[in-house]
Amino acid sequence: MSGPRLLLGFDYGTRQIGVAVGQAITGQARELCVLKAQNGVPDWSRVEQLVKEWRPDAMVVGLPLNMDGTPSEMSERAERFARRLHGRFGLPVHTHDERLTTFEAKGYRLAQGQRDGYRRRPVDALAAALLLEGWLAERPAG
């Protein structure tokens, strides 16, 4: 099989970064955790723990583009985060348009009956899973 088999996905944010794990063979991803961030900078030791634990072949970072497809300030920060991931871990890091994944994740939580806001159960990791599945869907499994 060519290409990555196991991937970590990141929904980048300045206060929280959602993390998901996905498999190319199934095209599915699942939520892992939400990392706290200070002005977009995560606890890199926690990211390193995840990389060591899951041993991904590659990583995917969501790009929060504007609705017209143009880059935003946040997408530029997400690209910088992607470059830092690559620099720290030496793995391929891909970016993927994540427009509306957080909106979709909130809708999913509402459909599950979550009505008490998103502090107790944030949507960031679910958004990471959705963007990772989107990236996987655009690539052949083998």
Curated annotation (Swiss-Prot):
GO molecular function: nuclease activity
GO cellular component: cytosol
Highest taxon in the source lineage: Bacteria
Record keywords: Cytoplasm, Hydrolase, Nuclease, Ribosome biogenesis
Signal peptide from the UniProt entry: none
SMART domains (alphabetical): YqgFc
Similarity-based family: Belongs to the YqgF nuclease family.
Functional note: Could be a nuclease involved in processing of the 5'-end of pre-16S rRNA.
Protein name (Swiss-Prot/TrEMBL): Putative pre-16S rRNA nuclease
Natural source organism: Azotobacter vinelandii (strain DJ / ATCC BAA-1303)
